[in-house]
Amino acid sequence: MIWCMIAALLLLAVFALSALIAEKCLQMVVNPVRYDVDYVKALETTNGFSDCIEAYETKWQRTPFVLHCAGTDISGEYMMNPADSGTPRKVAIICHGHTVNRYSDLKYADIFYRAGFSTVIFDERYFGESTGDFCTLGQNEARDVAAIIAYVRQIFGQDCVIGLHGESMGAATALLTLKYETPDFVIADCPFADSKLLFAQWLKRNLHIPIGLIWPILRRRAKRKYDYDVESVCPIAAVQGKNVPICLMHGKSDNLIPYTHSEMLRKACVNPNSELHLFENADHARSIVVARTEYERLVLAFLHNCGLYGTENKQ
């Protein structure tokens, strides 16, 4: 009898610990720290992108907008590029990563702007000036991007060329948007391929426990509290069968999302213009930091291969 009681207590302790870890993991995703504009500006300046911030704040023609998406206000801006006067117009929508805001988009928006694209930057739900009580790593965010695409078509014309660029969570969001829209291209910088795999790798690396201990609890809590289906946040499933050129960028020293996620995604791409580029000595979301010139060259080469950029367009 005593051994049965001990076994029951041990099982109860394991369940309680699993529930605690599941809740902590869920909260890291849905209610992470939110860095303000001053923090992100300082970070981007330290990383060498003060020129992009200056161009945005002093040179670009900025038009703010707010879109109402499923009870959430998405705050953003579009920058009409005087060089983007042809037909059709060309627009790049930039999606930032977890914990930051639209100022993190500027280093990427600058590449497109100088290449003759008009650009759109925005705060993902829960971050920056957008509203929202929680984040879903791309589930709801992809629908927001689909709404932004519809808005962009109203502003720039139904026939406009639309591309997506995303970093980290923003990259996953851009890829998940393929469930709802067919952009002309996607550039995904350090995305995850599958959220369950990402959780499993994080747990093994940091807590040395298997995903099976917490996944059922985490899934139930996410669905019950946030209507968040964590298992459906699977960019690789969204990519499969979609004839959209996708350029994947990833640091080989990424300690948050291993570059193998981008390798998996590349294998799922069907468009012949899809590419994968790995950057030596680049940690998470730092490929453009460690190799800015090469990063820009690869972006422009990809756009050229897609028929969207040529030397005659460069400013």
Predicted regions and their residues:
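Hydrolase active-site cap/lid region
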Residues: 176-228, 237
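Catalytic histidine-centered segment of alpha/beta-hydrolase-like enzymes
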Residues: 282-293
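Conserved alpha/beta-hydrolase
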Residues: 109-131
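Alpha/beta-hydrolase fold nucleophile elbow
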Residues: 156-168
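Short beta-strand/loop motif that positions the catalytic acidic residue
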Residues: 241-243, 248-250, 254
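Conserved alpha/beta-hydrolase "acid-adjacent" motif
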Residues: 255-261
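An N-terminal hydrophobic leader/cap segment in hydrolases
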Residues: 3-67
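Alpha/beta-hydrolase active-site loop
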Residues: 135-156
